[in-house]
């Protein structure tokens, strides 16, 4: 009789773990944050994830945000479960003690962000930016590009006059000549090149990788790992479709953002979509970003990027 008790206990424990896992794999609702121009917007408008989850009894609630930092604040306070942002916002969120997890990343896309100047500007290179007014979104991916581009040109961040503006305000300032240069990402980059004859003096190639990260709140990623993995898988399938059907993807994103389809066609030609799980190399590159922001004083503390590793990726 004594020998049966441990066996029964083990069976009960196994059943409990399996039951908990099954429950965790099927949340009633998944709340996803998105921006009009990012891959989750494409996923929303395509409807493929909604269809997949509906078959499993899972509802999706889509919540729009104006930018990555606000989205990650929503992730931190529990108003959303999943988000996709560029590489800088998660580092700033981690510095603010946000309890997030890196689920995966896109391919590097350095051609989708650049430093531009007016067509007739005397500025010919990054070195010419010394003492100039440079518009950018503070704490964004392009903030990292500017720091690294200046250092590559033998300058430092204090050698320019940063003018911190969101894209819409920076676009107006660029048009009026209130800033000498603008550091910006697609599709805004493609738009200003097409409609304002902006001239590129440096993109991110050879300087910074520029990833999109797929992020989750820690409670969601650890509590519903199968669902989180399924989202990454769906993003990978969507990426394959978008890369092979750029005209259709451009039409969807044009509708989402209000930008001309031609702007999105230009953007998608230099934007490789994709979704893969995190690797040591990508964590190293993200750590380099965080360390750079700390070094130049944009982050108040040192960030341990790997503290946001998903338990499924720990070895």
Language model segments and positions:
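Small-molecule pocket liners
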Residues: 39-40, 109-115, 198-199, 210-214, ...
């Amino acid at each position: 009789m004594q020998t049966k008790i441990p066996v029964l206990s083990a069976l009960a424990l196994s059943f409990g773990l399996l039951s908990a896992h099954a429950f965790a794999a099927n949340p009633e609702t998944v709340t996803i944050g998105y921006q009009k121009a990012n891959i989750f917007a494409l996923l929303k408008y395509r409807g493929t994830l909604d269809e997949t989850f509906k078959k499993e009894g899972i509802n999706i609630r889509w919540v729009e945000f104006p930018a990555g930092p606000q989205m990650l604040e929503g992730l931190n306070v529990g108003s959303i479960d999943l988000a996709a942002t560029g590489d800088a916002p998660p580092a700033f969120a981690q510095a603010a003690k946000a309890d997030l997890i890196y689920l995966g990343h896109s391919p590097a896309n350095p051609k989708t962000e650049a430093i531009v100047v007016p067509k007739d500007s005397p500025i010919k290179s990054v070195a010419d930016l010394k003492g100039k007014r440079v518009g950018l979104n503070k704490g964004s991916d392009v903030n990292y590009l500017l720091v690294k581009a200046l250092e590559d040109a033998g300058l430092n961040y204090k050698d320019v006059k940063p003018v911190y503006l969101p894209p819409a305000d920076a676009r107006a300032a660029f048009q009026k000549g209130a800033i000498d240069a603008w550091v910006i990402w697609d599709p805004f980059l493609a738009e200003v090149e097409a409609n304002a004859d902006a001239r590129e003096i440096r993109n991110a190639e050879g300087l910074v990788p520029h990833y999109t990260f797929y992020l989750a709140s820690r409670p969601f990623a650890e509590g519903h790992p199968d669902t989180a993995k399924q989202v990454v898988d769906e993003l990978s399938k969507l990426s394959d479709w978008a890369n092979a059907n750029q005209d259709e993807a451009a039409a969807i994103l044009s509708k989402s953002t209000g930008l001309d389809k031609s702007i999105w066609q230009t953007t998608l030609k230099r934007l490789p979509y994709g979704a893969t799980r995190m690797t040591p190399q990508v964590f190293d590159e993200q750590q380099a970003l965080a360390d750079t922001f700390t070094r130049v004083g944009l982050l108040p503390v040192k960030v341990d990027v790997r503290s946001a590793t998903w338990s499924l990726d720990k070895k």
